[in-house]
Amino acid sequence: MKRVLVRAPLLSQSGYGVHSRQVFKWLLSRKDVTISTHVLNWGNTSWMVNAEMEGGLIGEIMKRSGKPDDKGFDISFQVQLPDEWDPSLAKFNVGISAFVETDTCNPGWLEACEKMDCIIVPTEHIKKTIERTGKVTKPIYVVSETFPDEMLEPDVKPFPLEIDTDFNFLIVGQFTGNDPWNDRKNIFLTLKWLCEAFSGDKDVGIILKTNHGRGTRIDRQITSKIVRDIVSEVRHGEFPKVHLVHGNLETKEVAGLYKNPAVKSLVSLTRGEGFGL
C-alpha cells in the first residue's frame, strides 16, 4: 500500500475545491493506497463541514485530515497555485493547477514546475500556454475536469424559481472583483450587455447565480447591493428583470437549476478559460 497525501482546498466552496474533491474521490476508489489529507484555505470562500454532504465524501475527507509533519509519504497530490507547491512532502510529488485562464503564464511558475515530478492541468490550452512561456522538462499531463452524474439524471427535479419571465438567460459565477475591470468572470459587463441588448423587453429575464465569496446571509446582503447598483446603472427602465439566486446548492439543486424549463440559455462571458465548477 502506498501512502498518499492530498494537499488541497478539499472543503472549499470554490472551483479549486471541486477540482480537489475530484482528485480525492478518484484516490478513494483505489484499493492500493492509504490517504491522508491536508486541507487548505482558498481565499475567503466558505467550507463544507457537514460530513453527509457530497454523498458522504466530505466526511471521508475530514476523518483523514490533519497537518502531516512526517515526510514518509510515497506520493503527494497538491492542488494549488504553482508557487505554493512543496516538493519535499513525498518521494514523488504531483502538482495540479488550473494555472491561468488566458494565454500568458508567470515565468516564475515554470521554476515551480521543475521542482515537482510531474504536472497535471485540466486543458490543452493551459499546457500550451506553459510550454509557450518557457521550457519545462518535467512531464505535463492533461486530465479534464469532470461533472457530476446528477447532471445526466433524467428525473432531476427543476430548481424552484419564483419568476414570471418566459425567456431567461442563466449566468453562473462568483464576483471576483469590485469593478468591471478586475472581475475575472466578467459578471459586471455581462449584466450590462444583456440589459442593453434586451432593454425594455418584459418577456426576458436574467437569472444570476452568484455570490461574493461565501454562501452566508451577510454575503447575500453584500451581493444583493452589488447587483442592485449594477442594474440601476446599466438598465434603463424596468426590463429585463434580474433574478438573484444565492447560497450554497447541493449538486442536484444545481442540476435542477440548469434543467428548469424557464432557463433557455446559459451565458458565460468570462475573460478567460472558465469551467463554472
Task: Give the predicted meaning of each segment.
Residues 256-277:
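Acidic donor-binding loop of glycosyltransferase active sites
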